[in-house]
UniProtKB/Swiss-Prot annotation:
Belongs to the peptidase T1B family. HslV subfamily. HAMAP family: HslV. NCBIfam families: ATP_dep_HslV, PRK05456.1. It catalyses: ATP-dependent cleavage of peptide bonds with broad specificity. This is ATP-dependent protease subunit HslV. Its EC number is 3.4.25.2. GO terms for cellular component: HslUV protease complex; proteasome core complex. A double ring-shaped homohexamer of HslV is capped on each side by a ring-shaped HslU homohexamer. The assembly of the HslU/HslV complex is dependent on binding of ATP. One of its GO terms (biological process) is proteolysis involved in protein catabolic process. Keywords: Allosteric enzyme, Cytoplasm, Hydrolase, Metal-binding, Protease, Sodium, Threonine protease. Protease subunit of a proteasome-like degradation complex believed to be a general protein degrading machinery. It comes from Koribacter versatilis (strain Ellin345). It is found in: Cytoplasm. It comes from the Bacteria.
Amino acid sequence: MSSKRLVRSTTVLCVRRDGKVVMAADGQVTLGEGVIKHNARKLRRLYQDKIIAGFAGSTADAFSLFGRFESKLEQYHGNLSRAAVELGKDWRTDKMLRQLEALLLVADKDQTFLISGQGDVIEPDTGIAAIGSGGSYATAAATALLEHSTLDARQIAEEAMKIAGKICIYTNDRVTIEEL
């Protein structure tokens, strides 16, 4: 799967506002040019429900990464930044992991990280991060709403996902939301 194919997959968005953390993901699964599932769950709660994680890319690869990430969280006692960095290191150095094609978006009450297929671990500058084919649309919409409205984090995530779903053909309107 090429990196171009990787991002043609979904939209996962994380929004922070007023101490609330909300992650949202659409439910569409696309195989080639067709939609094969409309209500997939692309979000998970990890480490005693203190961390939310979402994925874009290959579903099988994402499940493998969720398992590894959960192991890192256990190993580092829920320290999100340490677990993310260690998973990133493994992803860069392990020959089998380098073959996995997925992106992870992970958040706890204090931090958000994007973990890429190249092993990059990126903490966004703002309270907004998104991955997947509709990520740019969701980020733009959420940024505008965060800066120019009084909507709470959940409302911003819901509205931004609606906008992304109207623009991105790989994103639908069946949104799953998790909050911290």
